[in-house]
Every structure is written in structure tokens, then in C-alpha cells.
Amino acid sequence: MADKELKFLVVDDFSTMRRIVRNLLKELGFNNVEEAEDGVDALNKLQAGGYGFVISDWNMPNMDGLELLKTIRADGAMSALPVLMVTAEAKKENIIAAAQAGASGYVVKPFTAATLEEKLNKIFEKLGM
């Protein structure tokens, strides 16, 4: 299991969704969670460093989750950062686009705590965390 001190950044323009994800992470033992309301806000925080995992929505103002993902993957300092997309975008082409852009995983809203835990564990296992 991953280090419980792992620092998460939860990115979503909907504050209730950020709170839901934060609370689910807390239930899983991860208390080091910060929030960003869009991709621009997230990038500013990520560039300051210290994050070990990003959970991002797709549809957001200013910079959407897919653009954020592509920017993270193109940045040498952040390119290996795990990014889990959590989004209402359930179409096959969206899932393929996220995978091609380098998403570590993909969860469609609405989802359960068990689904989030399963996806996180798969990513942790794949990355040897």
C-alpha cells in the first residue's frame, strides 16, 4: 500500500466534488490532500512541488483536465506524476483520449469509494508505490 503521507491534489471546479474525493481519500487513510478549482490553479500548485498524485476532473474552466494532463506529461519535473481522471465523460473516445495523453487511470462519475480505492491500488501497484 502507498505511503499514507502521499500528497494528493484534487482538481475539480465543483467544490462539492472536491470535498467528496477528499473525504474518500481520508477514509482510505490519506490525509495530505489539497484542492485546486481548475487546471491553471492546479499547475501553479504542482509547479511549487511536493505532490505525489493528482486526481482531476475533465470539464473545468480556464484549463480542462485533459489539457492539464498533457501539460503535466510534457513537463520534465512532473511527467511521472500519477494522474487519475475522475469525470462524467464516459464516452469511449474520451477514455481513449485520456489514455493516449498519459492518464494513469480513469473513473467515471458517479463512483463508489470501492471503485476509487480499486483504481488507486491498481495505480500504486503499477508504479511500485
Swiss-Prot record:
One of its GO terms (biological process) is regulation of bacterial-type flagellum-dependent cell motility. Binds 1 Mg(2+) ion per subunit. Its main location: cytoplasm. The modification N6-acetyllysine is found at residues 92, 109. Phosphorylated by CheA or acetylated by acetyl-CoA synthetase, depending on which acetate metabolism pathway is available. The major acetylation site seems to be Lys-92. Dephosphorylated (inactivated) by CheZ. One of its GO terms (cellular component) is bacterial-type flagellum. It is found in: Cytoplasm. Residues 7-124 form the Response regulatory domain. Changing residue 87 to I: Impairs chemotaxis. Keywords: Acetylation, Chemotaxis, Cytoplasm, Flagellar rotation, Magnesium, Metal-binding, Phosphoprotein, Two-component regulatory system. This is Chemotaxis protein CheY. It comes from Escherichia coli (strain K12). The gene is cheY.
